[in-house]
Amino acid sequence: MDVNPTLLFLKVPAQNAISTTFPYTGDPPYSHGTGTGYTMDTVNRTHQYSEKGKWTTNTETGAHQLNPIDGPLPEDNEPSGYAQTDCVLEAMAFLEESHPGIFENSCLETMEVIQQTRVDKLTQGRQTYDWTLNRNQPAATALANTIEVFRSNGLTANESGRLIDFLKDVIESMDKEEMEITTHFQRKRRVRDNMTKKMVTQRTIGKKKQRLNKRSYLIRALTLNTMTKDAERGKLKRRAIATPGMQIRGFVYFVETLARSICEKLEQSGLPVGGNEKKAKLANVVRKMMTNSQDTELSFTITGDNTKWNENQNPRMFLAMITYITRNQPEWFRNVLSIAPIMFSNKMARLGKGYMFKSKSMKLRTQIPAEMLASIDLKYFNESTRKKIEKIRPLLIDGTVSLSPGMMMGMFNMLSTVLGVSILNLGQKKYTKTTYWWDGLQSSDDFALIVNAPNHEGIQAGVDRFYRTCKLVGINMSKKKSYINRTGTFEFTSFFYRYGFVANFSMELPSFGVSGINESADMSIGVTVIKNNMINNDLGPATAQLALQLFIKDYRYTYRCHRGDTQIQTRRSFELKKLWEQTRSKAGLLVSDGGPNLYNIRNLHIPEVCLKWELMDEDYQGRLCNPLNPFVSHKEIESVNNAVVMPAHGPAKSMEYDAVATTHSWIPKRNRSILNTSQRGILEDEQMYQKCCNLFEKFFPSSSYRRPVGISSMVEAMVSRARIDARIDFESGRIKKEEFAEIMKICSTIEELRRQK
């Protein structure tokens, strides 16, 4: 029997069929090799968009810098970065006029945050450029290294633990004539192995002191390391992203705090909220535009796309915005906030690893590091690379490139949103002073513009005016990639609006399935994804039930844990059958131990262990939830964990799931190969750091855990806490007298050791 596919949709409103257009089934593309070429592309493009600006030389670093601000206005539709200071300031003034007190209040909120933020705020985030080692590191390690170097150079304000005091050290460090740092290096020796009598290469890790003069230090402090953005779908070419170092991070954080506070108060801003809250906020703006348009008026919506948003933004413009926003505030506050844009105006982009060369016969390979690009003969490169290098040479200093104009990806998302909204704000009739008016939505570089006018000419005029107003502040709406529709149908930040936002369930498809963390987490994440999609994405009960069955099937194949009474033979089936036969209450076995699946769409919110606890044999309970089980490198788990799920589009999302610690919550061991490299010292530091933090959390369970303020160190805080807890436990009879005495003795020993040190 033939089925006509159109019949499937007879009862379905057209907008609900969006999930059937899903193109992203396979793995997303990842980048290999170096990002050097992509970074050079970014730098060259950025300079091209601002080429009519003024060239200057930075007196401290000697870097050549291009300043396009207040440059000539473009005469064509090509993207350009010539923002006009007075236009930006005026847009800010009108934004404030429409929202009385918005800047004032946001400044007060930010000042409060600045007073309270601790320096460990900077340990959040993934890879960070570590200027002491000149490469990327996890954020916590990079921060620890920076503080260690600061202290050994006599900068000690950071010891208070407040972020603002750490930033005082950063400012002071820039005035120092030299900074002494410790770097890791490795020595290789050929030695004979006693056992096998073969020659082996032995690596030893050394640390050596190195002095950086003021110029070298400034270059490192202003450096953004670059990498290639991975897993981007729908693009032919990869592109570069940047990670700033610890000197810049803190200042950026405070600027973004201020901008976030402003965005929260702007109804057109798609940041900082997300999910359903964002949809509600946006639906409001659309509703407002549709209800306010008189019956005779036309209303059109542009699904907007901006050309090279980051590369045409300018830190100098952000400085002007901050200067205006904070104009009646105390001097110290204005200074703290203006440092980030000033540093970005003088930023250097690190070119990454450099180029790899292979000989024709593929026998020889050699790496040309970025530092050599200034002097190497260009005959070895192909035409396009040669052009790139020629363009970039005047800007090169020690393997970094001077990049004054432009903002690298994702640095000032909130502040650039404020700029975008300020242009949307100018669409009110009292500002356009004519028959057309506009409003819209802005979220970083993505926008939707709603224009109302009595006739088509008016709509066209409104769009033109918006386009030209944007040009004045360095925003380039792409005429090729933006399209216009009757209001009621548009797309914004991958939300599709058609008389209300349409659930695009297919976006979530890549996050269904088995994550591959461990048996316990995978089960929990799998059912949570299904539950969340029933709540947020119109996943109906029948489809959810099907998704659940498919997930269980997938899970059993992944972990080879088919039911104990199945005929399927796998490596594990022998053991699982034995367990099945020994178990009295078979319903109590976890799926990963060959048990049956008890999940249905009504109980997805219950962790599997809790769901089956009452059904388990007693000895099975004892084995499963036993922290002393010697065969398991056991991981303690907070009651809620975070998993990273990948939707098809947009950034990886963090999703909470319930975690019950069982013997299935194992962690795979770290790959050995890292232990032989110069990373090893860093790894050990990191583990020590981790252990200290874990220990500390033991003493201060998160409910009662306030970071020790004042001078007491972590150790002192833990010792005093141990004494208090021990006394309470002793007096209430929870511990014996001998145990109490032993705890007190250990505490005294620790204090004694500290005094000796």
Curated annotation (Swiss-Prot):
EC number(s) reported in the record: 2.7.7.48
Region (Disordered), start-end ranges: 56-78
Organism superkingdom: Viruses
Keyword Phosphoprotein: yes
Region forming the signal peptide: none
Keyword Transferase attributed: yes
Ranges for region Promoter-binding site: 249-256
Record-linked Gene3D superfamilies: 6.10.140.720
GO BP: DNA-templated transcription; symbiont-mediated suppression of host gene expression; symbiont-mediated suppression of host mRNA transcription via inhibition of RNA polymerase II activity; viral RNA genome replication; viral transcription
Database matches in PROSITE patterns: RDRP_SSRNA_NEG_SEG (PS50525)
Main location: host cell
Motif Nuclear localization signal location, chain numbering: 187-195, 203-216
Record field: catalytic activity: RNA(n) + a ribonucleoside 5'-triphosphate = RNA(n+1) + diphosphate
Annotated localization: Host nucleus; Host cytoplasm
Protein keywords: Eukaryotic host gene expression shutoff by virus, Eukaryotic host transcription shutoff by virus, Host cytoplasm, Host gene expression shutoff by virus, Host nucleus, Host-virus interaction, Inhibition of host RNA polymerase II by virus, Nucleotide-binding, Nucleotidyltransferase, Phosphoprotein, RNA-directed RNA polymerase, Transferase, Viral RNA replication, Viral transcription
PTM note: Phosphorylated by host PRKCA.
GO cellular component, one term: host cell cytoplasm
Protein family: Belongs to the influenza viruses polymerase PB1 family.
Subunit composition and interactions: Influenza RNA polymerase is composed of three subunits: PB1, PB2 and PA. Interacts (via N-terminus) with PA (via C-terminus). Interacts (via C-terminus) with PB2 (via N-terminus); this interaction is essential for transcription initiation.
Function: RNA-dependent RNA polymerase which is responsible for replication and transcription of virus RNA segments. The transcription of viral mRNAs occurs by a unique mechanism called cap-snatching. 5' methylated caps of cellular mRNAs are cleaved after 10-13 nucleotides by PA. In turn, these short capped RNAs are used as primers by PB1 for transcription of viral mRNAs. During virus replication, PB1 initiates RNA synthesis and copy vRNA into complementary RNA (cRNA) which in turn serves as a template for the production of more vRNAs.
Record protein name field: RNA-directed RNA polymerase catalytic subunit
Species in which this protein is naturally found: Influenza A virus (strain A/Ann Arbor/6/1960 H2N2)
Top-level taxonomy: Viruses, Riboviria, Orthornavirae, Negarnaviricota, Polyploviricotina
